[in-house]
From Swiss-Prot:
It holds the Pfam family PRMT_C. The lineage of its organism: Eukaryota, Metazoa, Ecdysozoa, Arthropoda, Hexapoda. It comes from Drosophila willistoni (Fruit fly). The gene is Art7. The keyword S-adenosyl-L-methionine applies. This is Protein arginine N-methyltransferase 7. Residues 14-355, 364-685 form the SAM-dependent MTase PRMT-type domain. Keywords: Methyltransferase, Repeat, S-adenosyl-L-methionine, Transferase.
C-alpha cells in the first residue's frame, strides 16, 4: 500500500503530491533520529559505563539491591551496561516505537533478555502496572546542547516523584552550566545587519532604527565553537559556572525557573556582544567521572590530548555532534571602557531554555526573555543573516551592479530579503521591482525603503504584478529563497526565469547567468560518523541498529544532505571538479553528466563535498563568481577552509575503503520536475 503527501519542490516552487510507502514516515524518523553519532562518542560511552560499574558496585557493597530504570533507552546500550555490571533488575523505557522494537532485538542478540522494556514515555509509567517497584538507580541521557531543551527538568522531577526511591542515585548525578563573555566581529554577523556601502565606501543603505533597537532572538545559536577561528574573537572573562542541576534531588526538585547575576571583571576593554555557553556532567555521585562539553581552550582535559598536523588542537579533544556549544547574543552589546571594569552577567532559565544579558549596574529584578521585533531574525536563519553581512560576497555583487547600472536601468529583482536589490536604487537605477513572495520579508524590505526614502522601488507579492516586462533591462538575484536548504535549491531562480522568458526583451541582462556545481572528495575527521555504522560499542553488538538505520536511510534520506562544513574539518583528497553547469538562459534543458575524479591523496574518502558557484556575468574572471564552497584555494592533503555563512552539500559513501583511487560520479538534472540526482561510487583501479 502507498500513501500520498503534499511536498513543496524547492526548485520548481510547486506543491506536488508525492507517493510514499505507508511506512515512509517511520523510515524518515528512524534515519533522522540522530542516535548514531552518540554511539560513536567513545568518551561518552566509556564514562557512562565506568560510572554504571562503579555505582552498582558501591550500592552492592552497601548491601543494597540495585534496581535500574533507563529512561529513553534508545538502542538499549545503557540498560545492557547496567545488566552486565550486575544490576538485580533493569527496566528500560522508550516511547519512539521503531527504536524500542530495535532495542528489543538488540537486547536479545546480546543475551540481555532479562531487561524489561516498556514502550512508553516515562511520564506514562505507573508503579504496580508497568513496573513492579520503584527503581533506586536511574541511568539516562536526556540532555541536549542547551542541557534542558529536551525537557530534562520535567522528566527528572516526575521520575523522582513517581518512579524512584527517596535514596535513588542518578547517572549522571548533576550538571553544571558555564558562560564566558566574548566579542567577535565574525560571530556578530550572524545576529545583526550592517549598513551597506558601495565600493568607494559611500552608504547605499542605512539601517532603520527598529533593527538597531531590536534585541534579537534569545534562542541559542548551536555550533562547534572550537572551530571558530581563535583570532576572530576576544574573551572578557574566564568561564564561570552559572547554574547547577542536581539530578539526584536529595534536597529538592529541580527548579523550573531561576535567575542568577554573576559579577565579573573585564579582562580587557571592548564591546561585550555574546556569551559562549557549554556544560559538563558528573556521571557519578562522587564527581570522579566528569564529561565536559567545553570548547578546546577551556576543556579540562586539553593537556591530555596531543595535537599535531593530522589533528589540530581544536580537534584533539573528544568530538561529539549531539552535545555542542552555543552562542547567546546579548540583547544590547555592553561597552566596557577599562580593564578590570566590573559588570554583571544576568543568567536566566525556564523549563526548556536559557537567556542572558549584561549590564554595568547590578539589575534589581529578573529580565524577561527577549524576542525579535524587527522581522530580520524571524524570517532568516543565522547563516542567512551572516550572509547578508558578508563583505567579500557583497563586493562581488556590487562590483557587477556598479559596472552595469545606468540611469536608464530598470531592474527586476528575484528572491527573499534581497537587500542588494534595494542597493541598486542608490546606484542610480531608474526603477527597481522586487518580487518577494514572503510577507514578512517584504515588510522588512519596506522598512528599509521608507527609512532610506527610496522612491523608485516597488515590492511585488506576485510575479504577475511586474509592470512592463519589455522595459526591463536587468533581472538580478543572489539568488536566495527561504525554502532552500541545499545550495542548488536556489535554482528556483531558473524556474522563475522560464515563466518570464517569452515576455522579456532580447537584450535583458540576467545575473547570475549560470551556476556550476562542484564536487570534492574529502577525508573528514569526524563528520562522517553521523552516518557511519556503529558495529560494536563497549563490547555490545549494535549491528541490528546499523541495519535498521541503513534500511531507513535508503528509503527516506536524500543521497546528499546539507551541512555547515566549516564546523567539520576535513582534508581535500583531490582538486574540485565541475560536475554540472546550468545556463539560466536555457534552464529548460535536461542535463546528464558523468565522469571520475582521481584521488591524489591516498586516504579514506568518507565524504564528497558539493557546492554551487554562481556566475554573475559572462567572464571566467574570479570576480565574476560568488561561491558557496571553499573560501580559499584548495591544497590537496590540507584542511579545507569553507564559507561560514552557507551550508554545503555532502554525500557519505555507503562503502568504506582506504584504497580507493577514484570517485566515479553521475548527475541528472530535470528542471521541469525539479530533480537533481547524484550518484557516487568509490573505485580501486
Amino acid at each position: 500500500m502507498s500513501s500520498f503527501s503534499q511536498v513543496r519542490n524547492p526548485i520548481t516552487g510547486q506543491a506536488t503530491w508525492q507517493e510514499n510507502a505507508d511506512d515512509y514516515d517511520y523510515h524518515q524518523e528512524v534515519a533522522n533520529a540522530g542516535f548514531g553519532d552518540m554511539l560513536h562518542d567513545w568518551e561518552r560511552n566509556q564514562k557512562y559505563y565506568a560510572a554504571i560499574k562503579k555505582t552498582i558496585k558501591r550500592m552492592q557493597a552497601d548491601g543494597r539491591e540495585v534496581h535500574v530504570l533507563d529512561i529513553g533507552t534508545g538502542t538499549g546500550i545503557l540498560s545492557m551496561m547496567a545488566l552486565k555490571a550486575g544490576a538485580d533488575s533493569v527496566t528500560a523505557c522508550e516511547a519512539f516505537l521503531p527504536m524500542a522494537n530495535c532495542a528489543a532485538k538488540i537486547m536479545t542478540a546480546n543475551g540481555a533478555d532479562k531487561i524489561q522494556l516498556i514502550r512508553k514515555r516515562s511520564t506514562e509509567i505507573q508503579i504496580g502496572v508497568d513496573m513492579a517497584r520503584r527503581a533506586n538507580l536511574l541511568v539516562a541521557e536526556l540532555l541536549d546542547t542547551e542541557l534542558i531543551g529536551e525537557g530534562a527538568i520535567g522528566i527528572y522531577n516526575h521520575a523522582h516523584q513517581e518512579l524512584l526511591t527517596k535514596d535513588a542515585l542518578c547517572i549522571p548525578a548533576r550538571a553544571r552550566c558555564y558562560a564566558q563573555v566574548a566579542t567577535s566581529s565574525l560571530a556578530k554577523q550572524w545576529n545583526g545587519f550592517k549598513l551597506m556601502a558601495n565600493l568607494d565606501g559611500e552608504t547605499l543603505l542605512r539601517v532603520p532604527p527598529q533593527l538597531n533597537e531590536c534585541k534579537g532572538d534569545a534562542a541559542l545559536h548551536d555550533l562547534q565553537l572550537s572551530q571558530l577561528p581563535t583570532e576572530s574573537f576576544r574573551l572578557f572573562s574566564k568561564p564561570v559556572e552559572i547554574f547547577e542541576f542536581d539530578f539526584q534531588q536529595h534536597l529538592e526538585p529541580i527548579q523550573k525557573q531561576r535567575n542568577k547575576v554573576v559579577p565579573l571583571q573585564a579582562s580587557q576593554p571592548g564591546s561585550a556582544d555574546m556569551v559562549f555557553y557549554w556544560w559538563d556532567i558528573d556521571l557519578d555521585h562522587e564527581s570522579e567521572i566528569v564529561l565536559s562539553c567545553a570548547p578546546f581552550w577551556a576543556h579540562p582535559d586539553k593537556d591530555k590530548h596531543v595535537a599535531g598536523e593530522d589533528k589540530p588542537l581544536a580537534n584533539a579533544i573528544p568530538w561529539r555532534d549531539h552535545w555542542m556549544q552555543a552562542i547567546y547574543y546579548i540583547p544590547k552589546p555592553l561597552h566596557l571602557s577599562n580593564t578590570k571594569e566590573t559588570f554583571y552577567l544576568s543568567c536566566h532559565h525556564d523549563e526548556y531554555s536559557l537567556w542572558f544579558d549584561a549590564q554595568l549596574k547590578e539589575p534589581a529584578e529578573s529580565i524577561e526573555r527577549h524576542h525579535c521585533t524587527c522581522d530580520l531574525h524571524l524570517i532568516n536563519p543565522r547563516s542567512r543573516i551572516g550572509q547578508l553581512n558578508q563583505s567579500p560576497r557583497n563586493k562581488r555583487y556590487l562590483n557587477y551592479l556598479e559596472e552595469t547600472t545606468t540611469k536608464d536601468s530598470q531592474f527586476l529583482v528575484l528572491g527573499n530579503s534581497c537587500f542588494l536589490g534595494l542597493a541598486t536604487c542608490g546606484l542610480g537605477a531608474a526603477s527597481v521591482e522586487i518580487y518577494d513572495s514572503n510577507s514578512l520579508s517584504r515588510r522588512l524590505l519596506d522598512s528599509f525603503i521608507k527609512f532610506n526614502k527610496l522612491e523608485n522601488v516597488s515590492l511585488l507579492e506576485k510575479l504577475e504584478d511586474v509592470q512592463d516586462h519589455s522595459k526591463l533591462t536587468h533581472i538580478f538575484a543572489e539568488p536566495y529563497f527561504i525554502n532552500s536548504i541545499l545550495p542548488w535549491d536556489n535554482f528556483y531562480f531558473g524556474t522563475l526565469l522560464l515563466s518570464l522568458k517569452d515576455k522579456l526583451s532580447e537584450g535583458t541582462q540576467i545575473s547570475p547567468c549560470a551556476a556550476r556545481i562542484f564536487a570534492l572528495p574529502m577525508e573528514f575527521l569526524d563528520l562522517h560518523k553521523i552516518r557511519a555504522p556503529v558495529g560494536n560499542c563497549e563490547g555490545f553488538d549494535l549491528s541490528l541498529f546499523d541495519e535498521m538505520v541503513k534500511d531507513s536511510a535508503d528509503k527516506a534520506v536524500s543521497s546528499v544532505e546539507a551541512q555547515p562544513l566549516w564546523e567539520y574539518p576535513g582534508r581535500a583528497l583531490a582538486q574540485p571538479q565541475e560536475i554540472l553547469r546550468v545556463d539560466f538562459a536555457n534552464f529548460n534543458q535536461e542535463l546528464h553528466q558523468q565522469g571520475s575524479i582521481e584521488l591524489i591523496r591516498s586516504k579514506e574518502c568518507n565524504g564528497i563535498a558539493l557546492w554551487v558557484d554562481w556566475q554573475l556575468y559572462s567572464s571566467e574572471s574570479p570576480k565574476a563568481f560568488v561561491t558557496s564552497g571553499p573560501s580559499q584555494p584548495i591544497e590537496i592533503g590540507k584542511f579545507v577552509k569553507w564559507d561560514m555563512f552557507v551550508r554545503q552539500g555532502v554525500h557519505f559513501p555507503q562503502t568504506r575503503t582506504t584504497n580507493a583511487t577514484q570517485v566515479e560520479w553521475q548527475i541528472d538534472f530535470k528542471p521541469f520536475l525539479g530533480e537533481l540526482n547524484f550518484k557516487f561510487d568509490l573505485k580501486s583501479i
